[in-house]
Amino acid sequence: MATDVTFDTSMGSFTVELYNSHAPKTCKNFATLAQRGYYNNVIFHRIIPNFMVQTGDPTGTGRGGSSIYGEKFEDEIRSDLKHTGAGILSMANSGPNTNGSQFFITLAPTPWLDGKHTIFGRVKSGMRIIQRMGLVKTNNEDRPLDEVKILRAKVVEAGSEE
């Protein structure tokens, strides 16, 4: 059974579909954090037009966040999954095997990230919201001038009715 996670944000809602069979540990971490409310009220701290939107750090600095496994956990990189276009859900990291809670969604093809970041899902609906986020004004550190925030994240089993 596929797992979907819906994010209600200050700019609208979007849903991601998790690749449980391709990145089981990453998907379990992400879904568990979402279910626990870890991502609620967390800002998108880094937005780069035509590249990606990044969030998942409760400190809002881009340096924080932890996983359900402790501080950091290993990559689950697969050669058959690539950053081929907009809407790819991938883990942010600071080098090999440094995954925590931060993630990004691509706004365009980003092939230079292949083999460096764990891809664990894709945007299933609400890509227009993500594209609008990619257009917000930012400062010289790629931080939005007006806060863009996750209000609530919730796990939805695909195929189930709410």
Swiss-Prot record:
Enzyme Commission number(s) of this protein: 5.2.1.8
GO molecular-function terms, A-Z: peptidyl-prolyl cis-trans isomerase activity
Catalyzed reactions per annotation: [protein]-peptidylproline (omega=180) = [protein]-peptidylproline (omega=0)
GO CC annotations on file: catalytic step 2 spliceosome
GO biological process: mRNA splicing, via spliceosome; protein folding
Entries under Pfam families matching the protein: Pro_isomerase (PF00160)
InterPro entries: Cyclophilin-like_dom_sf, Cyclophilin-type_PPIase, Cyclophilin-type_PPIase_CS, Cyclophilin-type_PPIase_dom, Cyclophilin_A-like
UniProt keyword annotations, A-Z: Isomerase, Rotamase
Domain of life: Eukaryota
Enzyme class: isomerase
The PPIase cyclophilin-type domain, residue ranges: 1-155
Function: PPIases accelerate the folding of proteins. It catalyzes the cis-trans isomerization of proline imidic peptide bonds in oligopeptides.
Family: Belongs to the cyclophilin-type PPIase family. PPIL1 subfamily.
Name listed for the protein in its UniProt record: Peptidyl-prolyl cis-trans isomerase-like 1
Organism of this sequence: Emericella nidulans (strain FGSC A4 / ATCC 38163 / CBS 112.46 / NRRL 194 / M139)
Gene: cyp1
